[in-house]
């Protein structure tokens, strides 16, 4: 279920402050955040935000088509190593 339209999109205040502070500077550095729940705003376009996946911060370059989505959608938290191999083929007959 999506968020109610009357509430509007959510973004953590500390993340918004970091993005606004970057807008004043000439050099764009990576913005580190733990806020996977924040919605991507149009003002985030062109910035690189390092989103925490539970182990490390994964850099995500924000593009125009990402606006409206959550930051956590672009950084998977689980590593899939594949299903178990079938040892019947390699066994001795």
Swiss-Prot record:
Keywords for the protein's UniProt record, in alphabetical order: Ribonucleoprotein, Ribosomal protein, RNA-binding, rRNA-binding
Keyword Ribosomal protein: yes
Role summary: Protein S19 forms a complex with S13 that binds strongly to the 16S ribosomal RNA.
Protein family membership: Belongs to the universal ribosomal protein uS19 family.
Origin: domain of life: Bacteria
InterPro entries recorded: Ribosomal_uS19 (IPR002222), Ribosomal_uS19_bac-type (IPR005732), Ribosomal_uS19_CS (IPR020934), Ribosomal_uS19_SF (IPR023575)
Organism the protein comes from: Ligilactobacillus salivarius (strain UCC118) (Lactobacillus salivarius)
PROSITE patterns: RIBOSOMAL_S19
GO cellular component: cytoplasm; small ribosomal subunit
GO biological process per UniProt: ribosomal small subunit assembly; translation
Protein name: Small ribosomal subunit protein uS19
Pfam families assigned to the protein according to its UniProt record, in alphabetical order: Ribosomal_S19
Single GO molecular function: structural constituent of ribosome
UniProt-listed PANTHER family: RIBOSOMAL PROTEIN S19P FAMILY MEMBER, SMALL RIBOSOMAL SUBUNIT PROTEIN US19M
């Amino acid at each position: 279920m999506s968020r109610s339209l009357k509430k509007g999109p959510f973004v953590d205040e500390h993340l918004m402050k970091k993005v606004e502070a970057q807008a004043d500077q000439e050099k764009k550095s990576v913005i580190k955040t733990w806020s996977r729940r924040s919605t991507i705003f149009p003002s985030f376009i062109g910035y690189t935000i390092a989103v925490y996946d539970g182990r490390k911060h994964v850099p995500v370059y924000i593009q125009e088509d990402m606006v409206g989505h959550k930051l956590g959608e672009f950084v998977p938290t689980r590593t899939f190593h594949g299903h178990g191999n079938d040892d019947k083929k390699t066994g001795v007959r």
